[in-house]
Amino acid sequence: VKDMVKQSGLPIEIVEGTKERHDAFKSGDVAIAASGTVALELAIVDVPHIIAYKVPKLTEWLARHFIHIQFVNLSNILLGKEVVPELLQQDCTVEKIMYYVEQFMKHKPVYNQQMDGFEKVRKLLGMGQQTPSDNAAEAIIKAIKNYRK
């Protein structure tokens, strides 16, 4: 990746390490993420974000038939409700992405609601106790078990 960036001649800075990555996250107003651990990191450092993701049709079909969870975003799974908008498959459009970006940038209550959710996520993960990945794994397993009841 470093060679490709260097060859491009573009003013791109590659950051390494957790602190540099989190500082880079916090330098923006809103993030668009593809879910996974990066979205959980964004929540931990209070960066408003949305999830935008498309998968191949076969993957979508398999997921719908074999994986029964209400949300894909880790913060949403942990909280049992949507605090991070999930724009998946046909909902992943430029118009919908821009709508949510504008909501976070122009409407303080929308922004505050997500920040409140992130505070709850950090508490659920027991930040400062076990490692965040261990806490996340335990909380997600618990959330999935509760959802299936």
Ranges and model annotations:
Residues 1-149:
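Nucleotide-activated sugar donor-binding and catalytic core shared by glycosyltransferases
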